[in-house]
Amino acid sequence: NKPLQVSVPDPSALTVLASKSHINPETKKYIEKYSISNSKNAGSSLKFCLIAAGEADLYPRLGRTMEWDTAAGQAILLGAGGHVTNLSTKEPLYYGKPGFENPFFIAHSDKGIIKN
């Protein structure tokens, strides 16, 4: 077994992950900012793991999630060298918020690919 490691993305040919049941107009509009070569659907924390394994580059989540939906996947992604960024503040996604609701976020393999 080899350790998980995010890939070095090609900004002109990114693989994006989308939620099977939560794709919305805001997410579609955000994805259109990028040069996408491949799109995959996956459920829940599996999206974080696909980025951690180097099989995808970007997962925008512009919909409601709770801390328990993302904590394990985020830990795996961070351990593999990836990032989870608050879409509004561009800061890392933090936990322990009142109400435990996450802001919109982007999980990604490399900070250099994120667009405003």
Predicted regions and their residues:
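Acidic, metal-binding active-site segment of PIN/NYN-like and related structure-specific nucleases
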Residues: 82-98
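Acidic beta-strand-loop-alpha-helix segment within the catalytic core
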Residues: 1-48, 97-116
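A generic structural signal for short
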Residues: 36, 61-62
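Alpha-to-beta junction loops
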Residues: 53-58, 81-83
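Short secondary-structure boundary segments
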Residues: 20, 63-65, 87-90
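Acidic donor-binding loop at a coil-to-helix junction in glycosyltransferase catalytic cores
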Residues: 68
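Hydrophobic residues within well-ordered alpha-helices
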Residues: 16, 50-52, 71-78
